[in-house]
Amino acid sequence: MPRPIQPLPRWADPDVPAGSLDPQGLSRRGLLRSAGLFGATFAGGAAFAGGALLAPTPAEAHTPASGDPNLVYLVGDHHVHSVYSHDAKYTFSQLAGAASRYGLDWMVFTEHSNIGHARAGGAEAEHREILKARADNKRMLIFQGLEWYIPGAEHCTVFSPPGRHEAELLTRFEQAYDGKLLGYTAGGPDHPDTPRNEAHAVKALQWLDQQRRCGYVDDVLVLANHPLRLGIDSPHEMRAWRDAAPGIMIGMEGAPGAQAGAFPGWAGPNSIRGEYVNKPSENSWPGYPAAAYVTYGGFDWATATVGGLWDAMLAEGRLFSITTNSDVHRVAYDTWKNGDWLPGQNFDNIGRLPDPVNTAEPQPGGDFWPGQFSRTHVGVTRYGYRDVMAGLRAGRVWVDHGQLIDGIDVRVNREHGIGRGVTLGGRLRVRRGEKIVLNVTVTTASRHNHHGEVPRLAHLDVIRGAVHGPVADRDEWRAPDTRVVHTADVEGRAGRYTLRIPVGKAEESFYLRLRGSDGKRNGPGFLGAAIDPHGPIPHEPGNGDPWLDTWCYTNPVFVDVVH
């Protein structure tokens, strides 16, 4: 007999009257209804019990949805820090409360690996607080994760669903494979330790894959965080991580957190959105241009550059997803400060910071609360921890800043194909010469965002890239056959509308992805106007109000031409 395990979010719960929902909740319930999933269907096909969904059987939990599913997109953040990170500030209750207030359905606490976290009981104490946070926030999916220091490279989110070994997995992984704890930090091309460190990162991902395969944990996922911030995640490393565990290492942050870090007059004259204020170092990969070290419309250069690193990986015909998150440590203009240590205490010997205390003065910080500005939307057919992870693995993901739109549904199909077609992360198999059509349904913002404005989408770009298979040069970061092929001017359009865009005949395998913005700041892309005529551009240092430059991106849909 299945048992109730997870109450639904208020906007999805039929027991919650529509009149009690805020505008965001009403909009999301409308999207749920339009997908035909409002009610028992969204709860895994079982009955409700007081607003709680009933646990699917193990077989149901592993059964993938069809290639043409009705999807609802859950809003989340996989990069959140609490007092269990040495450089953060907030308690679990503060962060979960903010996430609920700003409309998140799921979140991952990702504490930094650290001596105190790994060896002074921080991880175990953190797990007890995770359990309490779940009990106090029953309508939210709260994962325990880790921000892994990749040997010889940057950071990654690592997380698994609730289970008997969720905390133990992270502790074992941290102690055996963390680059910071092991001293495996060198990554420069000429450093003698670099080959060992890069190999250890691959072994780490393979170990996680094995824990999933043997059933030690039900699932585990890894995503690279702020990949170009320091220029130390080389293209060959990112490909090696992907190939080491394709179902585990699934993507990267397309846009970093710290998006509030460059408000004019706040963080200093050299500040950049995302805190991308670095220069190449001895550990940086020398093939990246200087322009790679700043953000573009808040997005990492690897994602924002049409024909750049993300496209070069997609052009191999392999899915590699993007996300966007808060990376919250210290919220801009917030008045809380770190509490004082008791005599003899420090992070290394107790594994956490003192609880913060409120003041009357704004404290330093460059972040937003989870869900306040950055959102990762994951397509699911029902509500649950493993469903979110399955949606991420399948690539059913789109991201936005500033609540730019309420929803987007992307379908690629033959011109006269049956059904609605393949959606984000999926693959459409066609014969050479078949005509392809792209259908995009946009639901515009129906309410004020968290800056007090109703966002307006100005344009939607279709980006197309040829698929050529594996690259000969594992450090190749260009995809020369990728470019913007269509721009839809949607200025002034409101409500829900569908764009039907003919793509032409499929002569070779390719992929499509979408990008849109509020239209306030754009210019020729990094690789030229012929490839990207109006892409995101960097802001002047110290003058990066994020609410005045908001974008949305989707994951790709692949079209595989068979002969």
Residue ranges: model-predicted function:
Residues R164-Q175, W241-Q259, P343-P362, H377-T381:
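Acidic, His- and aromatic-enriched active-site or binding-groove loops in soluble protein domains
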Residues V158-S160, R229-M249, R330-N349:
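Substrate-binding cleft/loops of secretory-pathway carbohydrate-active enzymes
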Residues I5-G19, H62-Y73, S85, F92-L95, ...:
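C-terminal functional module detector
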Residues A49, A59-A61:
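Boundary at the C-terminal end of the N-terminal hydrophobic targeting segment
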Residues M1-G30, G44-A46, A52-L54:
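N-terminal secretory signal peptides
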Residues F173-H191, G265-T295:
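A solvent-exposed, charged loop/short amphipathic helix patch at secondary-structure junctions
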Residues A35-A43:
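Sec-dependent signal peptide hydrophobic core
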Residues H62-R239, T303-T305, N325-V328, G523-G525, ...:
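A metal-dependent hydrolase metal-coordination microenvironment
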